[in-house]
Amino acid sequence: MMRLVTVIASAACLALSIAPGTATATAKVTTSVGASASATRAASGVQDWPAYLNGPLHNSYARSQKAITPRSARRVVQAWHFGRGTEFVASPTVSGGAVFIGSETGWFYKLKQTTGAVLARRFIGHEKAKTCGAIGTAATATVATDPVTHRATVYVSGANGYLYALNESNLALRWKAVIARPSATSSDYFDWSSPTVANGRIYVGVSSQCDKPLIRGGVIAYSQASGRKLAEFYTVPSGDIGGSVWSSVAVGPSGDLFVSTGNGPPANQLLGYSESIVKLDPSTLAVLGQFQVPAAQVGTDSDFGASPVVVGSYVGACNKDGIFYLLNQSSMTLDWETRIGDASYHGQTGECIATPAYNGKLLYFGGNQTTISGVVHQGSVQARAPGNGALVWETPLDTGVTGSPSIDGGGVLAVPGYYPTAGSPPVAVYLVNPASGQILRRLAHGQEFAQAVFAGGWLFSADSDGVYAWRVKR
């Protein structure tokens, strides 16, 4: 999988260099004056968005957020804008009255939720252009309660190959652990995967930066308290390359892990656990089951870049072949599949890499290029029945969607646009009525690779020109 346009860099060592975390109190930190899903919520609150896709289930549903509704959407205004001219690929994490986010410059920020003022910042790595482009932080942070100290802690991966545990209050370093250190001469290892915190462990995927070259992909499990490496899973045999884990690990109701994987080497794209959704034991990372994309559906650069979503006793993910696959968690057999968008050809038609939002009733998809009523559109937003994938409604967009949609309890879906269409209005975050597919508002700004999130009665987004906060004007 070649990771998108302006946000790319690249890949490859043949062996994974992994070491346990080491505690240290040094680093570049500047502060201003002044676990499981349950563990994540304990550190945050019902008004927060504490992790990528709102937690290990990856449902992107903020049930308690009801300020932004179909009626109030017309009164949504920009409250603040931080970091003008700075690109952000990671999505905002909101917890305890602050927004946590890393930038393409390598700086990780804690911003005041109501004003955007910088409360603290820490440099966590930036990779210069080598065989891929220059890149900073792409992974979204998780805020969760440390199982030993019971203090709120921020977990985030840096471009320098480390997983960081930071004090939530001032971003001081608690520990850091090696994921996989990038080469000095090629853009090999890079962490796109946002850390998943569950049951005292942290799970992180290992991937290349942009397939130049491929690396041996996998998943690493760490102790949440110390950063010690507990287990590792590789997608391809020792000595082989491929099977990057670009996405983030999902956790099912029973605690089992679900991982979506990238393509194998060109000579065998289905090597090992490549092009698969894999079920892993949460303690040992032993393989408990696998669904692999049928060979007939494997094309050029078609792999899983989207993170899995848990749908009751099922789990699913969209492949870059444009198809969403829903599986029975117990048997890992296919329940149904449906086409969301066109197959990707190295991003030329966009990519189906957004995880659908799920509110317990319907699945809401943001898609890449597709044809609706005989007309080709750059993207779409769709609602589908979780039982069989049947289309409930579909709304064409003049931009493709890369960031995952999110939904609040007030009845509004936020869909970030990324791929612009020549001659069309600027890309935007679309506010959509989930009952009908009606576009309620366009919050226009830059290209949005990240997910827009609902927290504290507001909406937070990030794009190629900074971080934004949106609220309902009284």
Where in the sequence are the language-model features?
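N-terminal functional modules and adjacent low-complexity/disordered segments of proteins
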Residues: A9-C13, P56, R63, T114
